[in-house]
Design a protein with these regions (language model features):
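Short, basic/hydrophobic alpha-helical segments
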Residues: 77-92
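Beta-edge loop/turn motif
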Residues: 87, 93-102
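Hydrophobic alpha-helical segments and helix pairs
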Residues: 16, 28, 32, 48-51
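Short, glycine/acidic-rich hinge or "gate" loops at secondary-structure transitions
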Residues: 26-44
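Sec-exported extracytoplasmic/periplasmic mature domains
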Residues: 18-26
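Sequence/fold signature of self-assembling virion shell proteins
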Residues: 4-8, 42-78, 103, 107-220
Length: 220
């Protein structure tokens, strides 16, 4: 991401502001809780949107997993099966989101197969995709750095944890954007342009939380 090999836009003030905003938006996607009404423009501000944790909590779909320290794939498959049996969720529409550490913990429980022949210059080790597969479809497990323990939260994110796993319906949960990120010039200070960034968006769950689950705090 360079401009004429001269400047990396990520190192400009505007670039850093965009990075901070995207991190904020990703954090809000999981743990946003406007019911706190913190009034501080945080993910717990009254103008924040409800994240997956809030949606699942309001639907009564939080499941305590603090006592599970092994057999993660088997447990996830059991939870997925229960969700399919008891709701309108289907295997081919389900997706799990987890922390990168939990993703590694899943892989550590499996028996790796390493193949090396005379033409191999490198040895590759690590997962390149994990899915729970059935004859009715498969549900991918996707790691993200945005599921973690966050300090300073008092709502549903107060117990955010690296062991959290979110299960949701990909067709029901959608990120709706009313206006993409844009900038408005505010003037100049010396040689610097001052701009304001804005974006209008929200998270929508058309299942009203019935297909959204938070599996809380696996012991990893």
């Amino acid at each position: 991401m360079t401009t004429l090999e001269y400047m990396d836009p990520r190192e400009t003030t505007l670039g850093q502001g965009a990075i901070a905003h995207n991190k904020f938006k990703a954090k809000q996607f999981y743990y946003g809780d406007p019911s706190v009404a913190a009034g501080d423009q945080s993910i717990e501000d009254g103008d924040a949107y409800e994240g997956l944790a809030k949606i699942s909590n309001d639907a009564g779909n939080d499941v305590d997993k603090s006592g599970v320290s092994s057999g993660f794939l088997e447990d996830l498959l059991d939870e997925l099966t229960d969700a399919v049996v008891n709701t309108g969720l289907t295997f081919d529409r389900a997706r799990f989101m987890c922390s990168q550490q939990f993703y590694n913990a899943i892989y550590d429980e499996q028996t790796p197969v390493i193949r090396i022949d005379g033409y191999d210059a490198d040895v590759e080790y690590g997962p390149q995709g994990i899915r729970l597969s059935t004859e009715f479809g498969s549900a991918p497990i996707t790691p993200t750095p945005n599921i973690q323990a966050y300090g300073g939260l008092s709502g549903v994110g107060s117990d955010a944890d690296l062991g959290d796993v979110f299960l949701f319906d990909e067709l029901a949960v959608q990120f709706r954007q009313l206006a993409p990120m844009s900038t408005v010039p505010l003037g100049r200070t010396g040689l610097a342009d001052r701009v304001s960034m804005f974006e209008y968006y929200t998270l929508v769950d058309r299942s009203q939380g019935n297909h959204t689950f938070r599996l809380k705090g696996y012991d990893i």
